[in-house]
């Protein structure tokens, strides 16, 4: 497969994206991922996750499998941290491109009512490389993505090479149960917590802690969990 590398494209929130905050126009903005329109609902969905993520002022965080970065946009609506740099990383140029990332920023800055306090850039990766320097990052996230990747050992190995020793990797997944072993959206097999810990241990990570079901819904068909791992 041909490797697409677009480099890092930096967007400073609050300029052209925020100028599109007119509500009617924002409704038409196209991007991939979450499209929350209610701040109260967004807060209920993300505040427990934010507490677990422990983002600090000045952090740089790589979001692997980000699509158009909507998770990052959503948490920036309610977050209190400042001067955090988010690197969006995905293989799908149909979702991760300048237009859709700017649309995502415009949507969530309009919902927030002001520009983000943080910066966002993106990197389009390939199957065999994240296109980030070795041992360059301290923090990395992967949300609802690992179950979709055929070569799980390969992507874990790639993330390990980019993270510094002692670096943190947070992985979120809907976990398989006896009754529900397939993801309802992508129709790919879900993983179990045991499998996840085994794969990460083999890839050079130690399990630290986790949080289960941080999303307040009445009925969760599969447990949604965030796992924190530390690179050895």
Identify what each model region corresponds to.
Residues 153-168:
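A short glycine-rich, Lys/Arg-flanked "PGG" loop and its adjoining helix->strand segment in the class I
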